[in-house]
């Protein structure tokens, strides 16, 4: 199963972009309480001073609301919002066109900034620090450097892989914000709100069942909600109950912990082929026929958060929780092995 085909893949799809379901203010935004509280202060301070907000870097897994928060920030600052992504900005001229069209205090959002072309990144440094573009016009002996003044703007960037950002780029963000997976209670509120805006009846137990399987990710919660709605409407149910949600998601192969076929293949392969590990990431990628990046960025973060695997210097290792979830008997020394590997990791 490819990552794009997964119902619970956290990457954005066309169906996920529903403006009516998106919160419009920080007060409407559910979850990330600490980040929201700090952003409120920074936004109010910048607005009171009439200055551009310091550059902001959002770090965290896909689907946690980085784009939505950037849009809300622009709205609460009362400025324009421009959006792009790292891979789209192929050359310096593309970035120059974006930056020269910004007005004073505007917000420019760059998603996946870790995938920015290094040559483009060099142009971004003086733009962020001095609000100037340093461009080279011409070639060879006739080449000359031209400085272009820019409006004082705010760059809001998002990355799922902080380690891939260069130190000079990372250090130019005055406001780093780490986003974490959501609790079941927070996702339950998001599911209820979505159901209300859809005009869909929803019991508390139904909302909780969807939230439990949403992998701590609002984007996945919204996608599961839309699929459960389809089952409920065809069944002519007045409201989504726990039974309807459970039947729908079970038929969609999303289990009680939010794991799908690919997650279970990952865990089962380590259990049955490698005795629970340790096993290297390249071996896992080859066994699953999935790119290493997809495994590290998409599959593993949730499994680690749920306590199903450990990353150690010698490779990935299944925990007792994983063996129990798979319904398999772990090796007798699994707990002792995990303790030893943890000590080695430290």
Swiss-Prot record:
The keyword Mitochondrion appears for this protein: no
InterPro entries listed in its UniProt record: AAA+_ATPase, AAA_lid_4, CbxX/CfxQ, DNA_helicase_Holl-junc_RuvB, P-loop_NTPase, RuvB-like_N, RuvB_C, WH-like_DNA-bd_sf
Positions of Mg(2+) binding: 67
Subcellular location: Cytoplasm
GO MF entries: ATP binding; ATP hydrolysis activity; four-way junction DNA binding; four-way junction helicase activity
SUPFAM superfamilies: P-loop containing nucleoside triphosphate hydrolases (SSF52540), Winged helix' DNA-binding domain (SSF46785)
Chain spans, region Large ATPase domain (RuvB-L): 1-182
Broadest EC class assigned to this enzyme: hydrolase
Region of interest called Small ATPAse domain (RuvB-S), as start-end residue ranges on this chain: 183-253
Superkingdom as given in the UniProt entry: Bacteria
Gene Ontology, cellular component aspect: cytoplasm; Holliday junction resolvase complex
Keyword set includes Hydrolase: yes
Entry keyword set: ATP-binding, Cytoplasm, DNA damage, DNA recombination, DNA repair, DNA-binding, Hydrolase, Nucleotide-binding
GO biological process, one term: DNA recombination
Chain positions recorded as DNA binding sites: 292, 311, 316
Region Head domain (RuvB-H), annotated ranges: 256-346
A Pfam short name: RuvB_N
Chain's role: The RuvA-RuvB-RuvC complex processes Holliday junction (HJ) DNA during genetic recombination and DNA repair, while the RuvA-RuvB complex plays an important role in the rescue of blocked DNA replication forks via replication fork reversal (RFR). RuvA specifically binds to HJ cruciform DNA, conferring on it an open structure. The RuvB hexamer acts as an ATP-dependent pump, pulling dsDNA into and through the RuvAB complex. RuvB forms 2 homohexamers on either side of HJ DNA bound by 1 or 2 RuvA tetramers; 4 subunits per hexamer contact DNA at a time.
Swiss-Prot/TrEMBL domain comment: Has 3 domains, the large (RuvB-L) and small ATPase (RuvB-S) domains and the C-terminal head (RuvB-H) domain. The head domain binds DNA, while the ATPase domains jointly bind ATP, ADP or are empty depending on the state of the subunit in the translocation cycle. During a single DNA translocation step the structure of each domain remains the same, but their relative positions change.
PANTHER family: HOLLIDAY JUNCTION BRANCH MIGRATION COMPLEX SUBUNIT RUVB, PTHR42848
Family according to the record: Belongs to the RuvB family.
Protein name from the UniProt record: Holliday junction branch migration complex subunit RuvB
Originating species: Sinorhizobium medicae (strain WSM419)
């Amino acid at each position: 199963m490819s990552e794009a085909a997964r119902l619970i893949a956290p990457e954005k799809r066309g169906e996920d972009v529903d403006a009516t379901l998106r919160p419009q203010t920080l007060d409407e935004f559910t979850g990330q309480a600490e980040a929201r509280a700090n952003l409120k202060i920074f936004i109010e301070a910048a607005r009171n001073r009439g200055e551009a907000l310091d550059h902001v870097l959002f770090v965290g897994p896909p689907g946690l609301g980085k784009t939505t928060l950037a849009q809300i920030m622009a709205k609460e600052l009362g400025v324009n919002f421009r959006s792009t992504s790292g891979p789209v900005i192929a050359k310096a001229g593309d970035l120059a066109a974006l930056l020269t069209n910004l007005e004073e205090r505007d917000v420019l959002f760059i998603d996946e900034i870790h995938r920015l072309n290094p040559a483009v990144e060099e142009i971004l440094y003086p733009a962020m620090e001095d609000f100037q573009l340093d461009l080279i016009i011409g070639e060879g002996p006739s080449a000359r450097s031209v400085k272009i003044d820019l409006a004082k703007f705010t760059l809001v960037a998002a990355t799922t892989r902080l380690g891939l950002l260069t130190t000079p780029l990372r250090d130019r963000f005055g406001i780093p914000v780490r986003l974490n997976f959501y609790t079941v209670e927070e996702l339950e509120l998001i599911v209820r709100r979505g159901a209300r805006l859809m005009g869909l009846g929803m019991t508390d137990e139904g909302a909780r069942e969807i939230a439990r399987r949403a992998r701590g990710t609002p984007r996945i919660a919204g996608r599961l909600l839309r699929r459960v709605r389809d089952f409920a409407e065809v069944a002519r149910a007045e409201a989504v109950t726990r039974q309807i949600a459970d039947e729908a998601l079970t038929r969609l192969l999303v289990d009680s912990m939010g794991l799908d076929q690919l997650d279970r293949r990952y865990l089962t392969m380590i259990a049955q082929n490698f005795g629970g590990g340790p096993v290297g990431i390249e071996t896992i990628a080859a066994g699953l026929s999935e790119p290493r990046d997809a495994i590290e960025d998409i599959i593993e973060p949730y499994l680690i958060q749920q306590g199903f695997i450990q990353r150690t210097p010698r490779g990935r290792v299944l925990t007792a929780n994983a063996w129990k979830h798979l319904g398999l008997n772990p090796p007798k020394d699994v707990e002792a092995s995990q303790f030893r590997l943890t000590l080695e990791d430290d």
